[in-house]
Each structure stands twice: as structure tokens, then as C-alpha cells.
Amino acid sequence: VTANWHQGNAAEDGSPTRGWLVGHFIDPSEGVRSSKDVEVKWFTHPAGDRRAEWTSDDQRTTLVLLVHGKFRIDLTESSATMTQQGDYVMWGPGIDHSWEAIEESTVMTVRWPSQT
């Protein structure tokens, strides 16, 4: 029987999955962290870290929340730079994105649904 609750550290628990804590890709033996409904990521990006490649035809809704640092999101519709703790960018299905950590940045990402 898998546990229906979990306590941990986001940086440690997400380490094997590039920061992802919750999602369909988490082994069901991890219990409540395995979900087809939502994905949650916590990650600290070093300054200059970037994903220059754009996502392609992503059909999920995404929220990226800045915990600290300076982080830019480029969207097919616009660009946004988050500079203050609590700044966020959210976009819906069909909008592609890339990103860059202008300074060392910790961000929390929430996407849904998890499996498309």
C-alpha cells in the first residue's frame, strides 16, 4: 500500500527528476507524489542557465512562480522578466515558451494536466 501523504524537501526529492516533485513520471510507489492531474517542480537555476529551444505545441496550462532571483520567460505571445519574490507568469494550452535565469533563480513550476 502506498502512502497517501508525504513530507520532504523539494530540492532533495526533486533531484532525481530534474526538480519535478509531482507528476505522472513519478513512480506510483512514491504514493501521493505520482499524479496524472498536475506536475510540480522546484528548481534553483544558476545564473545564465537557459533553455533556448522552444517547447512545441504544449497543450497544458503552466504557472511559473519566482521564489528568488531574476528569471525571464519568453512566450510565443510576449516576454516577461520576474524580479520580485512572488512574481509569476501563467499561460494556457498552445503557447510555447523558453526561459533564462538572468541571476541565480529559484522557481516553482506547476503544470496541468500532467499527462497529455
What are these regions (language model features)?
Residues 52-53, 73-74, 91, 96-102:
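Short beta-strand His + acidic residue motifs that chelate non-heme Fe in jelly-roll/DSBH
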Residues 77-94:
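Short acidic-glycine-tyrosine-enriched beta hairpin
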Residues 1-47, 52-54:
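A short, N-terminal "cap"/entry segment at the start of jelly-roll beta-barrel domains
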Residues 43, 90, 103-116:
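A short hydrophobic beta-strand segment most commonly corresponding to one strand
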